[in-house]
């Protein structure tokens, strides 16, 4: 996603900021003659970042956080989009003019961390100006996210950066975890999903259910080599955004090829943003259909039970 954003909105200018939901921003961006819409969601149940063609208008009265962003970066230029390691964090560095006409820089940081997801607005020194969600000391003993506090990334020192991990670090990390080797990989490396960890084991010919201690030194070395080959595609930007379907139901998505999904049908897309929108909108539609059918079954079952009881009473 970072690669895609750098290809599309780098050096582009923000033209509009809306806050359609309490935990969501829709940022309209112009790059030459092309208009992009960037959705930033810090939803606890479905945090997302992607480019979309669909517009989501904000409320008539903009929330305070939205008004603050409009004041500071309503016409800012996007200087960079970065990701620390492979953390689930995107940092947008923005350049704008202040009230005096001086050039200033700010950071908009999006953390995709489940129920702890947040969108945080900071100055260039990392001082928090405001955030879409305030986190007090009573809410979290790990980190406060409040205006005036210094921003820092939540502690992930127990995990290694897969882009820089050496063979010794990789093997030591998975040996330290007495669990299936695929789980040991994604538990030890930032940004590695269970699907990708399974794929690395599959490509290396390693039984993912075995522990690292069950593997010989040669096999562990081979596993590390396969891991580095896979990460090389990330370094080179060799992405193949795809969704894997079981019938009409989307089961998984990936920016990199997943060859062990033999039973699923693969559909490739132009961008990871298109993948994210298609995957989650389809899943939501199927979930709603399932819920409505379940509700309908409940109504029918209740009516049948009621009529059955009436029939039994009339038969006596």
Placement of each model-derived feature along the sequence:
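Extended, highly charged segments
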Residues: 1-316
């Amino acid at each position: 996603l970072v690669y895609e954003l750098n290809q599309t909105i780098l050096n582009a200018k923000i033209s509009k900021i809306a806050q359609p939901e309490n935990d969501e921003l829709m940022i309209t961006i112009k790059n030459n003659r092309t208009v992009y819409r960037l959705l930033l969601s810090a939803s606890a149940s479905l945090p997302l970042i992607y480019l979309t063609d669909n517009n989501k208008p904000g409320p008539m009265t903009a929330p305070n956080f939205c008004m603050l962003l409009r004041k500071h970066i309503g016409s800012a230029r996007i200087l960079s989009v970065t990701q620390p390691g492979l953390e689930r964090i995107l940092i947008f560095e923005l350049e704008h003019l202040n009230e005096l006409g001086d050039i200033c820089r700010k950071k908009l940081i999006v953390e995709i961390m489940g129920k702890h997801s947040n969108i945080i607005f900071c100055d260039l020194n990392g001082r928090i100006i405001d955030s879409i969600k305030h986190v007090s000391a009573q809410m979290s003993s790990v980190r406060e996210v409040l205006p005036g506090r210094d921003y820092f990334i939540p502690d992930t020192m127990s995990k290694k950066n897969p882009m820089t991990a050496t063979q010794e670090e990789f093997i030591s990390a998975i040996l330290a975890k007495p669990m299936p080797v695929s789980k040991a990989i994604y538990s030890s490396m930032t940004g590695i999903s269970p699907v990708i960890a399974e794929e690395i084991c599959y490509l290396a010919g390693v039984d993912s259910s075995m522990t690292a201690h069950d593997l010989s030194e040669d096999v562990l070395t081979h596993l590390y080599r396969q891991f580095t080959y896979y990460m090389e595609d990330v370094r080179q930007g060799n992405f193949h955004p795809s969704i894997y379907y079981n019938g009409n139901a989307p089961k998984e998505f990936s920016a990199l090829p997943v060859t062990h999904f033999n039973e699923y049908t693969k559909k490739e897309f132009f961008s990871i943003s298109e993948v994210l929108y298609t995957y989650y909108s389809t899943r939501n539609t199927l979930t709603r259909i399932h819920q409505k059918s379940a509700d309908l079954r409940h109504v029918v079952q209740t009516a049948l039970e009621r009529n059955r009881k009436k029939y039994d009473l009339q038969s006596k």
